[in-house]
Amino acid sequence: MSTVDLTYWDLAASTSLVLIAVAISFFQGLGLERSLIWAACRTVIQLLSVGYVLRWIFQVEHPVAVLALVLLMVTVAGRAAVQRSDYTFPRAKLLAFLVLLTTGLSISYIVTKGIIGLERWYEPRYLIPLLGMILGNTLTGISLGLHSLLHALKRERDVVEMELSLGASAREAVAEPMRRAVKQAMVPIINSMMVVGLVSLPGMMTGQILAGNDPLMAVKYQILVMFMLAGTTALTGIGMSYVTYRKLFNNNHQLLSELITKQN
């Protein structure tokens, strides 16, 4: 089965679907017309730009080009993860970047080299899509976990400091907020795994089917992706909670609550 190629005229015709949303916003007085049009324009520009960049990277297959795109993706994901939280602390974006980079590349290596069995684990046709799915899902987990932990340290500051005064170490005093943070980070992927294939067909699976691949092969890859996302989300949740705790306590086991600030 061959894939039906969409022309630019087909894409232009698809804008009528966005215009339906614009019309509803106008007649219902929602005031979202400009936002919808701007969002549609950004969608076209961003995706076409990514498409041309990926086509070039797939053609040259040079490790430096792949690394540059990986660093860009992780940087954007790290910033987005921290910005989605109501609270932040100094160097939070840098720490999120490091956590996402180490866990993302580690899991990608395990999947591409150890499970799929690629000769070159950084094969861009595999690494870039897989890493993109990892970052897209784990940044949500980091954001939820970070918000939970920082909010708890602000709200439960007296409880934490009381435990410290009674002889608990910083790690012991923050153990429960960290557990809640990791649990919060895991909720979205667990919910997705519960309903996958029943309520919705994931993007990767749908894309492979539309591309003409065998549905069972698409399902196998999707199962691999879901398990990959579960493991990565757990690792990034624990990793971000740990580096946050290390940043907010000094060597004397004192909570530096003044470092936690509310974002605009």
PLM segments and residue spans:
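Structural signature of hydrophobic alpha-helical transmembrane segments
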Residues: 4-17, 60-75
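Loop-to-helix entry region at the N-terminal start of transmembrane alpha-helices
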Residues: 10-14, 65, 87-145
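C-terminal ends of transmembrane helices
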Residues: 22-34, 77-88
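Loop-to-helix transition at the N-terminal end of transmembrane alpha-helices
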Residues: 31-70
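Short cytoplasmic-facing helical segments at TM-TM junctions of multi-pass membrane proteins
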Residues: 148-184
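Transmembrane alpha-helices
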Residues: 173-201
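Non-cytoplasmic
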Residues: 191-216, 220, 236
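Hydrophobic alpha-helical transmembrane segments of polytopic membrane proteins
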Residues: 216-245
